[in-house]
Curated annotation (Swiss-Prot):
Superkingdom of this protein's organism: Eukaryota
Protein name: Alpha-actinin A
UniProt keyword list: Actin-binding, Calcium, Cytoplasm, Cytoplasmic vesicle, Developmental protein, Metal-binding, Repeat, Vacuole
GO terms for cellular component: actin filament; cell cortex; cell leading edge; cell projection; contractile vacuole; cortical actin cytoskeleton; cytosol; extracellular matrix
Spectrin repeats: 240-365, 366-480, 481-601, 602-714
Organism lineage string: Eukaryota, Amoebozoa, Evosea, Eumycetozoa, Dictyostelia
Gene source species: Dictyostelium discoideum (Social amoeba)
SMART domains according to UniProt: CH, EFh, efhand_Ca_insen, SPEC
Gene (name only): abpA
Length: 861
C-alpha cells in the first residue's frame, strides 16, 4: 500500500516552525548517516549533500535493498544532477510512495523544506511503514508499542510523540524494559529532565548502537518537540528491540528444551543418590541384624528386642517409603523418556527397583532371623535364670543344713542316761540317712542342672561346679566327719545301751526320705509354665506325667508311715525325738502337694488351649498375609508392564488397577483384625510366615503410592501433549492487542487491522506471508479474522517443536545466522542463569564461540 502524500505547502506549520526545522535537519541527517555508514559514506549538510543524487542513490539502495540504475557517478553539469535526483525520485515512487510537490529541481537547488519533506517520506516508507501499513496505523502501532513497554513505570505516560518524551523518562523506561542491566530506573531523579534525556541518548548510542538523532536542547528548548524527529528516533528503538526479541524467543525455545533435559538429568542424579544411600543403609542394617551378640542376661536380650521393635516401628517405615518412592521415580522417569521417545534410563547394577526390592527382601529375611534368634536367646536366658535360681536354692538349703548339723554335731553331748545316749545314736543314724538322701538327691539335681546349663552354653558352669565341689569337699565332708567322730564317742559310751524303739528310728529315717522327695517334687508342681507353643506344653506334660507315676509310688510310702505312726501311738509313743518331721506335718505337706498337682493339671490344660488357639490365629494370619502379598506382587508386575504407547490406554489401565485396589481394602482390614487378636494374645512370633502386619501394610501402601504416582505421571504427560506452549501472560497480551485494533468491537479484524495488530506485537510479515496466513486461518472465507482465528494463529506460531532441527534453528537465530554462538549472545537471549551455566559447561568450544550444532545433535541422541 502506498504512503499518503506529504504536503509541502506553506501551510505546513511543522515545517514553518524554525525550531522544528532545525531539529528535523539534525535528526534526519543522523538517520541518513546511520544507513550510509554501512557503505562507508556520510553526509554533513542534508540540503546540499544530496544535490548531485549520488549519496541519495546510495541511501535508497541501502534501505530498500534495491539498486538505483543508470546513476551518473561523475556529474559535471546541473542537468546531470537533475537527472540523477530524478532517477532517485522515480525509485522512491516505484516502492509505492507518491511524491506530491517534490521535484528534482527543488532538491538540486538546495530547497531545505523540500529536502526534509522528501527524507520524511523516505523514513515513513522504509523505517516506520514496516511497523504498520500506512502512516496513521504505523504511528498508532508504534505508540501502542511504547505504551505497553512503559506501562507501570513511575511518572511515565506515553500519549504522543512530543511532550510525552520531553522529560526523558519514557526513553529510559524503554531501555530499562528491554535491558534492565543498563539503567537503574528507580534511582533516576524524575525531575532532572536534561540528565534523563542525556543518559538515555548516551546509553542508546553506546550500548544499543542507536545513533544520537536528538540533542537535549531539541527536547527542552521548545514547548513541543518535533513529532517527526521523535518518531524517527523512537522507531530506531523499536527496530533494535524487535531484533532482540527474536533472539529472546529463540532463547526461550532452547530454554524449554534444556528444561526438559536438565530435569531428566537431575531426576536421574537424584534417583542414583537416593538409591545408593538406601542400598548402603540396607546393607549396613542387614550386617547389624546378622550379629548374634545379645549379651548374657535377660535384660540385655530384652533391650535388644526393644531396640528391634523400635527399629521396625520408627526407623524402617521411612526407608520402606523410600523404596516405594524410588520405584515411582524410576517408573516415572522411564515413562517420561518413553513418551518423548528417548532411550530408557539404565541404572547401575544393584540400583534398579527390582534389585532394590531383592535387597529389601534380604533385609526382611535378616529381620525375621534376627527376631527368631532373639526369641531363642531370650528363652535360653530364661531357662538359665530358672536353673540358676533352682541351683542356688538347692545349694543354699544344703549349706544351711550343714551349718545347722555342724552346730549340733559339735556339741559332743552324750546324755546322762542310756536312753539319752541311745537316743543320740538313733538320732545320728537318722542324720546319716538324711545326709545320704540329701547328698544323693541334691548332688543328682545339681549335676542335672549343670548338664542343662552346659547344654545351654552358659559360661558360668565352671564356677558353679567349683562352688559345688568345694562345698562337698569341705563343709559337707566336715559335717560327715563330725558325725563319724560323734558316733564313735557315743559308741564308746554305749556298751550299756540297748536298742531303743527301732520303730521310731525307722519312722524318722523313712519320713525324712519322703520329706526330701516332697520338697524336691515342688519343682515339678510349682515351677512357672514358660512356653510359647503347643509342643512346649506337650513336653512339660510328658515330664509331669512321669512325675505323677513316681508320686503314686511315694504314696505307698506315706501309707506305710501312717501305719508305723499308728503302731507307735498304740505303744504310747506319740513323740519321736529322732524324727525331724512328724507324720501330721508330712501329711500336710503331702496334701499341699496334691492341691498343687490338681492346680498344675488345670494350668497345663489352660495353657494347651491358649497355645492351640494362638496357633490357629497364626495360621489364619499367614494365609491372609500370603494372599495379600501375592496380590500386591502380581499387581505391581501389572503396573510395570503397563507400557502401551497410547498414554490414554496407560491411564485407563492404571485407573482400573486403583479401583480394584480400593475394592481389596476389606481383606487388609481382616488382616488387621487377626493381628489385633494376636496382639491381645501377646503373640509376638509366627512360625507359619515371615510376613508381619507392618511388612504387608508397607507393600499395600507401596502399591497404592506407585499406582497413584503412575496415574499422575501419565496424566501429566497427556496434559503436556495438550498444552499449547503459550503462557497466560502472552494470551493476555494477545487479547489486549486484538481489542485495541477492534475499533467497532465486532470481535473481528479486517486485513489492515490484522496486519497492524501483528506488527504491534513484533510479528513482521511480508505481503505474501500475510496473504498465506489469512488464507490459512480465515476458515469461513469472509475476509475478516475473528478473535478465535487470531488466537489459533498466535498459538500455532508460538508452539515450540521438540526436535533437533527446531533446536538448531532456534540457536541459529540467537547466533545471528552464524554456525557458532558466543557467550554474549547466549546471555542476551536467555535469562535463566542455570540454563546459561549448563550451556557454557556442555557446549563444545570452537574458534570464536561454541558449537551449538553438535550440542543439539547430542541432546537428541
Amino acid at each position: 500500500m502506498s504512503e499518503e502524500p506529504t504536503p509541502v505547502s506553506g501551510n505546513d506549520k511543522q515545517l514553518l516552525n524554525k525550531a522544528w526545522e532545525i531539529t528535523q535537519k539534525k535528526t534526519f541527517t543522523a538517520w541518513c548517516n546511520s544507513h550510509l555508514r554501512k557503505l562507508g559514506s556520510s553526509i554533513e549538510q542534508i540540503d546540499t549533500d544530496f544535490t548531485d543524487g549520488i549519496k541519495l542513490a546510495q541511501l535508497l539502495e541501502v534501505i530498500s535493498n534495491d539498486p538505483v540504475f543508470k546513476v551518473n557517478k561523475t556529474p559535471k553539469l546541473r542537468i546531470h544532477n537533475i537527472q540523477n535526483v530524478g532517477l532517485c525520485l522515480k525509485h522512491i515512487e516505484s516502492h509505492g510512495v507518491k511524491l506530491v510537490g517534490i521535484g528534482a529541481e527543488e532538491l538540486v537547488d538546495k530547497n531545505l523544506k523540500m529536502t526534509l519533506g522528501m527524507i520524511w517520506t523516505i523514513i515513513l516508507r522504509f523505517a516506520i511503514q514496516d511497523i504498520s501499513i500506512e502512516e496513521l496505523s504505523a504511528k498508532e502501532a508504534l505508540l501502542l508499542w511504547c505504551q505497553r513497554k512503559t506501562e507501570g513505570y513511575d511518572r511515565v505516560k506515553v500519549g504522543n510523540f512530543h511532550t510525552s518524551f520531553q522529560d526523558g523518562l519514557a526513553f529510559c523506561a524503554l531501555i530499562h524494559k528491554h535491558r534492565p542491566d543498563l539503567i537503574n530506573f528507580d534511582s533516576l531523579n524524575k525531575d532532572d529532565k536534561a540528565g534523563n534525556l542525556q543518559l538515555a541518548f548516551d546509553i542508546a548510542e553506546k550500548e544499543l548502537d542507536i545513533p544520537k538523532m536528538l540533542d537535549v536542547s531539541d527536547m527542552l528548548d521548545v514547548v513541543r518537540p518535533d513529532e517527526r524527529s521523535v518518531m524517527t528516533y523512537v522507531a530506531q528503538y523499536y527496530h533494535h528491540f524487535s531484533a532482540s526479541r527474536k533472539a529472546e524467543t529463540a532463547g526461550k525455545q532452547v530454554g524449554k528444551v534444556l528444561d526438559t533435559f536438565m530435569l531428566l538429568e537431575q531426576t536421574k542424579s537424584d534417583y542414583l543418590k537416593r538409591a545408593n544411600e538406601l542400598v548402603q543403609w540396607i546393607n549396613d542394617k542387614q550386617a547389624s541384624l546378622e550379629s548374634r551378640d545379645f549379651g548374657d542376661s535377660i535384660e540385655s536380650v530384652q533391650s535388644f528386642m526393644n531396640a528391634h521393635k523400635e527399629y521396625k516401628k520408627t526407623e524402617k517405615p521411612p526407608k520402606g517409603q523410600e523404596v516405594s518412592e524410588l520405584e515411582a521415580i524410576y517408573n516415572s522417569l522411564q515413562t517420561k523418556l518413553r513418551l518423548i521417545k528417548r532411550e530408557p534410563f539404565v541404572a547401575p547394577a544393584g540400583l534398579t527397583p527390582n534389585e532394590i526390592d531383592s535387597t529389601w527382601s534380604a533385609l526382611e529375611k535378616a529381620e525375621q532371623e534376627h527376631a527368631e534368634a532373639l526369641r531363642i536367646e531370650l528363652k535360653r536366658q530364661k531357662k538359665i535364670a530358672v536353673l540358676l535360681q533352682k541351683y542356688n536354692r538347692i545349694l543354699k538349703k544344703l549349706e544351711n543344713w550343714a551349718t545347722t548339723k555342724s552346730v549340733y554335731l559339735g556339741s559332743n553331748e552324750t546324755g546322762d542316761s542310756i536312753t539319752a545316749v541311745q537316743a543320740k545314736l538313733k538320732n545320728l543314724e537318722a542324720f546319716d540317712g538324711e545326709c545320704q538322701s540329701l547328698e544323693g538327691q541334691s548332688n543328682s539335681d545339681l549335676l542335672s542342672i549343670l548338664a542343662q546349663l552346659t547344654e545351654l552354653n552358659y559360661n558360668g558352669v565352671p564356677e558353679l561346679t567349683e562352688r559345688k565341689d568345694t562345698f562337698f569337699a569341705q563343709q559337707w565332708t566336715g559335717v560327715k566327719s563330725s558325725a563319724e567322730t560323734y558316733k564313735n564317742t557315743l559308741l564308746a559310751e554305749l556298751e550299756r545301751l540297748q536298742k531303743i524303739e527301732d520303730s521310731l528310728v525307722e519312722f524318722a529315717k523313712r519320713a525324712a526320705q519322703l520329706n526330701v522327695w516332697i520338697e524336691a517334687a515342688d519343682d515339678h508342681v510349682f515351677d512357672p509354665i514358660n512356653v510359647d507353643s503347643v509342643q512346649g506344653v506337650q513336653e512339660i506334660q510328658e515330664k509331669f506325667d512321669a512325675f505323677l507315676h513316681d508320686q503314686s509310688q511315694q504314696f505307698a510310702e506315706l501309707e506305710a508311715l501312717a501305719a508305723l505312726t499308728q503302731q507307735l501311738r498304740e505303744l504310747g509313743r506319740s513323740e519321736n525325738d529322732y524324727s525331724v518331721i512328724s507324720y501330721d506335718e508330712l501329711s500336710a505337706k503331702w496334701n499341699n502337694l496334691l492341691a498343687g498337682i490338681e492346680e498344675r493339671k488345670v494350668q497345663l490344660a489352660n495353657e494347651l488351649t491358649t497355645q492351640t488357639n494362638n496357633d490357629v490365629l497364626c495360621q489364619s494370619f499367614s494365609v491372609k498375609a500370603n494372599e495379600i502379598s501375592d496380590y500386591v506382587r502380581v499387581t505391581l508386575d501389572a503396573i510395570s508392564q503397563n507400557t502401551s504407547s497410547d498414554p490414554q490406554e496407560q491411564l485407563n489401565n492404571i485407573r482400573a488397577i486403583i479401583t480394584a485396589h480400593a475394592e481389596k481394602k476389606p481383606e487388609l482390614d481382616e488382616l488387621y483384625t487377626i493381628a489385633s487378636q494376636l496382639e491381645e494374645a501377646q503373640v509376638v512370633d509366627n512360625k507359619h510366615t515371615q510376613h508381619s502386619l507392618e511388612s504387608i501394610k508397607l507393600k499395600w501402601d507401596k502399591l497404592n503410592t506407585l499406582a497413584k504416582k503412575n496415574e499422575q505421571v501419565v496424566e501429566g504427560e497427556i496434559l503436556a501433549k495438550q498444552l499449547t506452549g503459550v503462557t497466560a501472560e502472552e494470551l493476555s497480551e494477545f487479547k489486549a492487542c486484538f481489542s485495541h485494533f477492534d475499533k467497532d468491537n465486532d470481535n473481528k479484524l479486517n486485513r489492515l487491522e490484522f496486519s497492524s495488530c501483528l506488527k504491534s506485537i513484533g510479528d513482521e510479515l511480508t505481503e505474501e506471508q500475510l496473504n498465506q496466513v489469512i488464507s490459512k486461518i480465515d476458515t469461513d472465507g469472509n475476509g475478516t479474522i475473528s478473535f478465535e482465528e487470531f488466537i489459533d494463529y498466535m498459538v500455532s506460531s508460538r508452539k515450540g517443536t521438540d526436535s533437533v532441527e527446531s533446536t538448531k534453528a532456534a540457536f541459529k537465530v540467537m547466533a545471528e545466522d552464524k554456525d557458532f554462538i558466543t557467550e554474549a549472545q547466549i546471555r542476551a537471549a536467555i535469562s535463566d542463569s542455570k540454563q546459561i551455566d549448563y550451556l557454557l559447561a556442555s557446549m563444545p568450544a570452537v574458534e570464536g564461540g561454541f558449537d551449538y550444532n553438535s550440542f543439539a545433535e547430542k541432546l537428541y541422541q
